[in-house]
Amino acid sequence: PRKANAAADKAEEKTPVKDIVDFMLPIVIAVILALLLKTLVFANAVVPSGSMLSTIEIGDRIVASRLAYITNDPQRYDVVIFKYPDDERQNYVKRIIGLPGETVEIKDGTVYVTQTNGKTIQLRDDFVTYCTPVGDYGPYKVPEDSYFMMGDNRNDSEDSRFWDHKFVKKKKIVGKVVFCYYPSIHKIK
């Protein structure tokens, strides 16, 4: 019995290496989990411009769900982070206005969409509170598997109306913006 107890005591002895491993292991696991979450589940961004005022302010830090469109398609009015079609090294944040197969036209600042069923609707603009939209643009026929984007601050937004490559492919959408976490926490609608 004494030999068994001595062996058990020796196994439980702390060594400097074991202390370091015991200390570092939870930190390493936490870092790996954080990286996996950032890479596979969430995307975050700092908004550098006023193109989405007043929905998203300059300097706001936002979080998007990378999983939002795995089983569902993006919907009109979703605010998304996506790869800018004219330079995919940059991420942009805009609102989805036109869906695949639709035609988008802006007349006197009002956005009209001709849906795939041929019905033309005037889009709601209750989120466009920062300015009075002006101008005529389009018509733009949205290709299959692509989307037409506009900023909420319509008079100060570099969006689908002005890009060389007017549309964002679904696979280039990084995620659906779900909330702002700085400087205040609030849901993005």
Please annotate each region the language model reported.
Residues 24-40:
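Hydrophobic membrane-insertion alpha-helices, especially the h-region
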Residues 49:
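A short acidic/basic microdomain associated with nuclease active sites
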Residues 1-21, 40, 45-46, 54, ...:
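Soluble "head" domains of membrane/secretory-pathway proteins
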